[in-house]
Amino acid sequence: MFEVCYLFGDVFISDDNNACALIVYPDKKKTSLKSILLDLKLITQCVGFKNIKKTLSREALIQKIQPKETMTYLWFIGVYLAEQNKGIGSLLLQEIIQQSIQNNRPIYLETSTIKNLPWYSKFGFKVYSEQDLSYRLYFLKRGL
């Protein structure tokens, strides 16, 4: 994931190294031998061969629902458990929002973690779609 974002997006790491956000700019992601190899690496190291079908179905659904516009795609944001609720993730998200405003890009993301919805809402994100995939998947957008 890191390498994909390094090539086709941005990697944000908090000053204390306790939080990280991975960003992809879909309009910059081009299919190449390197991108295919990175996808294969993601499958073998993160997803696993047993979960390929489920993962590909989920990704196809996301592609179908996501608007085809220039965007900042927040692929992942996380804070070490012991460091949560200290504002580290909020600072990181504010930095991403500021950069997205400067680059004139809305931010899109998905989450299945219901307790995170109020947190995203606090930063101006709105749910624009919900899907049932044996769990609830929420699609969020923060406009400019």
Q: Model-found features: residue ranges?
A:
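Conserved acetyl-CoA-binding loop-helix of GNAT-fold acetyltransferases
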Residues: 79, 85-98
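Conserved acyl-donor/pantetheine-binding loop and adjacent beta-alpha core of acyl/acetyltransferases
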Residues: 20-77, 84
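Conserved beta-hairpin
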Residues: 7-24, 80
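Conserved GNAT acetyl-CoA-binding A-motif
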Residues: 70-72, 99-112
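Conserved beta-strand-loop-alpha-helix junction that forms the acyl-donor binding cleft
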Residues: 75-84, 108-118, 133, 141-143
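A generic structural signal for well-ordered alpha-helical segments
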Residues: 4-6, 100, 120
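Conserved active-site alpha-helix within GNAT-family acetyltransferase domains
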Residues: 90, 102-104, 113-130, 134
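Short beta-strand micro-motifs in enzyme catalytic cores
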Residues: 10-12, 72, 136-140
